[in-house]
Amino acid sequence: VLDSSSSNQKPLNIGFTLGDPAGIGPEIFFKFQQNFQNNPNFNILLIDDLKAYNQVLSKIKLGQPSGFCGEHCYHSLKKADFLFRQNQIDYLVTGPVSKESLWMAGLNFSGQTELLASINQLNSDDIEMFFVLDDFRVVLATRHISINQVSDNLKKRLPRVLDNATNAMQSIFKIPKPKIAVAGLNPHAGENGIIGKEETEFMSRMLNHFSTKQIADVNGPFSADALFARAAQNYLNNRIQEYDLFVAAYHDQILPLIKGLGGFRAVNLTAGLPYLRLSVDHGTGFDIAGQNIASCEGLLACTQLILKISHREKAKFA
C-alpha cells in the first residue's frame, strides 16, 4: 500500500487490478499511481502479483487476447475478493479485461461482472451493472447477450432488476425513494403494439406491479430516443436529471450515448456484490497497447465516485 495518510480522516484503501496484461490497463494504472499516490484521501493497493504479471508478459504479445491473460485476470479478482474479506481493501477498481482472453482461459463468462458473481457464489441475476456519469445514472436490464435474446431475457429479469436497482440506489446513493424511468425495448416504445409487443405484453404490467411496493417512483416504458435525448440535453446544459435512475432495455441502447457524452469520465459500477466494484468505462485498448498514449482519466473518475459515495466528495486531488 502506498500510504497517503496525512488527512485527519482515515484514508480509504482502494484495491486496483491491472486488467488484461496485453491491453492498456497496466499503463493507465501506473500513470494514475504516479499522479495520485500521495493523495491523503486514499491508499492505492495494487492487487496483481507483479512477478506473475511479468511472467505473463513473457508469454504474450501486446494487443492480442490470450488465455494466459485471462487466467491472470481471474487470479487477480480472486485475490481482490480475499483481500476484501480480510478487511484489507474498502473498494475495488478493476482494469479492462478482454472477454476473449477469459474464454481462451476456459472461463466462460461474458465479463468481469459475471465472473465476480461466480467468485462470490452469487447468481449473476442478483447483481446489476450501473453506468454513472455525474447524476446521469443508468442500469442495464440485460447485459452481455446477443440482440435476439434480449426480449426473453428482459421478460425474465426486469422485475428483479427493478428490485436490485432500487436497493442499490438506497444503499449506495442514499436516495430513499428513487425516481426511475424505464426505456421501452422497441422504437417509440412499440406504439401500443404496432411496432413491437414487449411493452404492452409484459413491461407495462411489470412496472405497474412494482409500483404497488411503493419503494420507488417507477415510470415508463418510454420511447428510448426521447427519454435519453432529454437526459443528454440535461447533462450538456448542467441541469439536474429529471430521474434518479434510468433503466435501459439492452446494452447498446444506452452505452453509445454514455460514452459519447462522458468519454472516460463515465464509471461502470457493479451493485450486489459484498463490496463495491467500479471499473473504467472503456475496453482493453489493444490497438494502442504499449504506445504510452492511453489516458488514466477513467481511473480518476472511479476514484472520484468512490470519494463521493463515501461522503468525501469535497476531497481534493493532489
Roles of regions detected by a PLM:
Residues 1-115, 155-267, 273-318:
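Contiguous, glycine/small-aliphatic-enriched amphipathic segments in soluble metabolic enzymes
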Residues 119-136, 271-287:
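Short, flexible loop segments at boundaries between secondary-structure elements
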Residues 44, 113, 127-128, 136-139:
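Small-molecule pocket liners
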Residues 130-160:
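Ligand-binding beta-strand-loop-alpha-helix segment within the catalytic cores
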